[in-house]
């Protein structure tokens, strides 16, 4: 590949990354704005039930898919059409089975259902029905992107996001009834499931074979270690929320979960960029070009850091003002939790899970994540008991740093590439330093000039000062 071809390919990847980023930004913006409406329509107890419901769904999604949809990034680009169809059919069948099992676990019929979920038991079959369909239809969140049909991915994502936001917000506004909201969420997931079936039928069909034991065995052997490792990783980020749900009232848990929404901002940048780069990284690994694969990962992470660090810095400086403006003063204690989270979210700029997957390091990742999860839960519990609501986030933050240290050293051992050469550390450090400078300057000016002002003028002045310092030296080029 000559220099001109490489440049064109790089530009195409960047455009694809930003296209996916725009779609995911829209989706996450709606998910971000929806609670803004709900806190003004629902009382604190009902809003706590809504957040608890999504925590339960998120925990199911950490384990039930077992990374089967994401692993298609590995299998589909290197397979012919009949084999691709087989992989897709097997993945769909697997998700349907794990979805049904998950539905049983969160059902009131389960005698071992966690006590923290008792507030949801009164909604009967609505919760398990939603869970079963949500797990099964999650394949549509991956498949068009894996097959590089970005416009179709955009249509599917935007359609479901709009339906969910409009139906739930409308139901809350008109009725303030969580039971009605549950029925509307069920309608949304039925739309998502229909889109998945239509996509598979249009591009792959339903022809036989639907299942081959040998092929499925290879698929599950490749996927299971990564799925379990990913599940442990996601459970680490949710464990502190379960601690908060167990130790504190639904109102306090709702405040804690509002702070956790910040992680969605991180996922916008990480997921969109990595999903755009992943097919090309997979092809490079298959061709044996490990150095180029690592360079592509480093470029993706530098792109994420350039945009993510300033967002985290601004939120760190003005957390309480943001909560008052967006979620009302009733949930202002989320501000302290946000600051604790930001200390950990910054390290997520260095995304290495895709590299571990392509290097087939699933068993190691699983073991590491089990160890880190076992350490994070007691830390969160101790922090919650002795330090209050913000202390409950300590476990997941500590776990993030330990995880990155372990994974970077493992990649160095397997690839022969030292840690200091795996990422564009100097670039990331420069963005972080400018973020720290802009954060400190914006905070000092606002607290000096508008100490007693309302949230909006404080945020406006802070944003102007922050942007004036950070943007000229870091955002001149985005690609």
Model-derived segments and spans:
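Interhelical loop/hinge segments that connect adjacent transmembrane helices in multipass membrane
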Residues: 1-13, 151, 155, 178-182, ...
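Membrane-water interface segments that mark the loop-to-transmembrane alpha-helix transition
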Residues: 11, 15-28, 52-53, 58, ...
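Transmembrane helical elements of multi-pass membrane transporters/channels
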Residues: 16-32, 160, 181-196, 200, ...
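Alpha-helical transmembrane segments of multi-pass membrane proteins
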Residues: 59, 63, 96-100, 104, ...
């Amino acid at each position: 590949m000559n220099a001109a071809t490489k440049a064109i390919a790089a530009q195409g990847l960047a455009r694809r990354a930003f296209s996916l980023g725009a779609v995911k930004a829209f989706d996450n913006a709606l998910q971000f704005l929806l609670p803004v409406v709900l806190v003004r329509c629902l009382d604190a107890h009902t809003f706590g039930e809504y957040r608890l419901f999504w925590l339960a769904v998120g925990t199911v999604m950490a384990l039930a898919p077992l990374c089967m949809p994401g692993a298609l990034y590995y299998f589909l680009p290197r397979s012919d059409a009949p084999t691709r169809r087989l992989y897709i059919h097997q993945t769909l069948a697997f998700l349907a089975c794990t979805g049904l099992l998950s539905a049983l676990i969160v059902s009131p019929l389960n005698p071992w259902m966690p006590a923290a979920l008792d507030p949801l038991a009164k909604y009967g079959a609505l919760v398990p029905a939603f869970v079963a369909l949500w797990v099964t239809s999650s394949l549509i969140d991956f498949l068009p992107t894996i097959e590089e049909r970005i416009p179709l991915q955009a249509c599917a994502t935007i359609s479901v996001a709009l339906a969910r936001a409009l139906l739930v917000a409308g139901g809350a506004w008109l009725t303030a009834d969580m039971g009605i909201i549950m029925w509307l969420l069920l309608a949304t997931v039925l739309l998502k499931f229909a889109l998945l079936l239509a996509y598979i039928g249009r591009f792959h069909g339903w022809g036989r074979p639907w299942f081959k034991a040998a092929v499925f065995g290879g698929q599950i052997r490749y996927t299971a270690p990564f799925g379990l490792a990913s599940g442990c990783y996601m459970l680490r980020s949710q464990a502190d929320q379960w601690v908060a749900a167990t130790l504190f009232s639904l109102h306090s848990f709702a405040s804690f979960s509002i702070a956790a929404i910040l992680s969605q901002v991180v996922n916008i940048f990480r997921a969109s960029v990595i999903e755009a780069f992943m097919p090309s990284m997979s092809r490079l690994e298959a061709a044996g070009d490990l150095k180029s694969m690592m360079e592509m990962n480093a470029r993706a992470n530098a792109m994420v850091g350039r945009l993510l660090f300033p967002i985290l810095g601004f939120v760190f400086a003005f957390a309480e003002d943001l909560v008052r403006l967006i979620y009302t003063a009733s949930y202002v204690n989320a501000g302290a939790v946000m600051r604790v989270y930001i200390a950990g979210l910054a390290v997520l700029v260095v995304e290495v899970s895709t590299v571990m997957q392509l290097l087939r390091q699933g068993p190691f990742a699983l073991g590491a994540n089990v160890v880190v999860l076992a350490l994070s839960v007691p830390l969160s519990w101790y922090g919650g008991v002795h330090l209050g609501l913000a202390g409950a986030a300590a476990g997941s933050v500590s776990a993030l740093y330990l995880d990155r240290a372990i994974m970077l050293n493992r990649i160095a051992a397997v690839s022969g590439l030292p840690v200091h050469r795996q990422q564009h550390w100097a670039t990331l450090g420069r963005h972080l330093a400018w973020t720290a400078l802009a954060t400190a300057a914006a905070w000092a000016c606002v607290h000096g000039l508008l100490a007693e002002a309302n949230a909006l003028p404080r945020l406006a002045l802070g944003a102007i000062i922050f942007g004036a310092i950070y943007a000229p030296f870091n955002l001149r080029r985005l690609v």
